[in-house]
């Protein structure tokens, strides 16, 4: 049998000639740099998965943002929501600091939300709605909050 004839090898996980480089996960920046220097095929992906918790669409949005080339600004609170927070706070004679302690947040967060600079967080908005007794999400922003559903 000459070297140039194809040979058939039977078995599990058989590699002829030692096979090629196996796929491996680089855990450090040094390993990534080493792979780049040696000219190996390289794919750098972030993993946004968690094991025992409910997945949130935030990871999908982060992946989408990572893959896009243009700059995407994060969402901000609408100015009408900020005005409603300010009006509701003043109706109850609360300072920003008082409202912040009532909802267990920092006064800077209340300030950011009132000025329209804050990044919307449903938990914080829910706490503010209950503390002020007005709607801050959905339609009819600024209207009194209805009682619990029966």
UniProtKB/Swiss-Prot annotation:
Keywords: Activator, DNA-binding, Transcription, Transcription regulation
Annotated HTH cro/C1-type domain residues: 85-139
GO molecular function (one): DNA binding
GO CC annotation: nucleus
Origin: domain of life: Eukaryota
Positions of the UniProt region annotated as Disordered: 1-29
SUPFAM superfamilies: lambda repressor-like DNA-binding domains
InterPro entries on file: Cro/C1-type_HTH, Lambda_DNA-bd_dom_sf, MBF1_N
SMART domains xref list: HTH_XRE
DNA-binding region: 96-115
CDD domains (alphabetical): HTH_XRE
PANTHER family: ENDOTHELIAL DIFFERENTIATION-RELATED FACTOR 1 (PTHR10245:SF15), ENDOTHELIAL DIFFERENTIATION-RELATED FACTOR 1 MULTIPROTEIN BRIDGING FACTOR 1 (PTHR10245)
Job description of the protein: Transcriptional coactivator that stimulates GCN4-dependent transcriptional activity by bridging the DNA-binding region of GCN4 and TBP (SPT15), thereby recruiting TBP to GCN4-bound promoters. Involved in induction of the ribosome quality control (RQC) pathway; a pathway that degrades nascent peptide chains during problematic translation. Required to prevent stalled ribosomes from frameshifting.
Homology family: Belongs to the MBF1 family.
Protein name: Multiprotein-bridging factor 1
Gene: MBF1
């Amino acid at each position: 049998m000459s070297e140039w004839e194809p040979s058939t090898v039977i078995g599990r996980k058989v590699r002829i000639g030692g096979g090629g480089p196996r796929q491996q996960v680089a855990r450090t920046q040094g390993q990534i740099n080493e792979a780049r220097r040696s000219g190996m095929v390289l794919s750098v992906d972030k993993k946004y998965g968690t094991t025992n918790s409910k997945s949130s669409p935030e990871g999908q949005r982060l992946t989408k943002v990572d893959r896009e080339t243009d700059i995407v600004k994060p969402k901000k609170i609408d100015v009408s929501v900020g005005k409603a927070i300010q009006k509701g706070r003043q109706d109850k004679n609360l300072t920003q600091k008082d409202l912040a302690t009532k909802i267990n947040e920092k006064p800077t967060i209340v300030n950011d939300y009132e000025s329209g600079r804050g990044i919307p967080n449903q938990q914080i908005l829910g706490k503010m709605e209950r503390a002020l007794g007005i709607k801050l999400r959905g339609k009819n922003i600024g209207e009194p909050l209805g009682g619990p559903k029966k």
